[in-house]
Amino acid sequence: MLPSDLVNYKKKSRKIIALTAWDSISGSIAEQANVDLVLVGDSLAMVCLGYKSTLPLTLENIIYHTNAVSRGFKKKIEEQPLVVSDMPFLTYQCGEDKAVEYAGKIIQSTYAKAVKVEGAEPEIQKVISRLIRMGIPVMGHIGLTPQSYLNIGLRKQGESLASQEKIKKEASILEELGCFSIVLEHIPDLLAKEIKNSLTIPIIGIGAGNYCDGQVRVTADLLGLNDDQPPFCQPIIQGKKLFKDKLKEWVDSERLN
């Protein structure tokens, strides 16, 4: 799977499904579930490493976990899902040269075929443009951008007219820069629909309604493994309680033997 395949999926109106993964087991499960894209997201800082936000995640962390995820794949190379790695906080906000160096390390050192970059501010636009010119595919990410939570919080974006116009303009700019896809997070459904219909690249939603070209979810949220669930992700099972109860049964039974 290559980034260009997702663009072709949109042309064919084929829904794109993505999940996050953080180790070989979650990577293997995602592959066996037949997802199109596996995102090694900076959410692993909280899901896997116990941090309270995505900000502490390092470049070394993302490289380590991206390789772990890929080792879980068992299908033929051409049948494996596309792997996209998040660029951690301060690996692309530090100037074009450093961003190229850090993104290059991710692509060179892992099986990732693209990186995801949050935001569309003028300085981020320059970074994205440079990365793409250097041959590194980029997935954009606008709306709620968790790496900016200290400034904007974690509230829903695009609820005012000004905010909606800003997000629409950012999406258009990201396509013009050459992004192969854009993640829209926690914005109104109809805004996502308007953006999707105005662009030729696929729009992947998370908390952006069902009109998008595809959906991505944090696997741990979907499986109910986290104590704090985002408002836009309804768990399909209460995984944490299920595993806890079953393990407690085993512990109690072993104590009686």
From Swiss-Prot:
Domain of life assignment: Bacteria
EC number in record: 2.1.2.11
Any Pfam family the entry gives: Pantoate_transf
Binding site for Mg(2+): D42, D86, E118
Alphabetized CDD domains for the sequence: KPHMT-like
Assigned keywords, A-Z: Cytoplasm, Magnesium, Metal-binding, Pantothenate biosynthesis, Transferase
Xref: Gene3D superfamilies: Phosphoenolpyruvate-binding domains
Quaternary structure annotation from Swiss-Prot or TrEMBL: Homodecamer; pentamer of dimers.
Xref: PANTHER family: 3-METHYL-2-OXOBUTANOATE HYDROXYMETHYLTRANSFERASE
Protein name in the entry: 3-methyl-2-oxobutanoate hydroxymethyltransferase
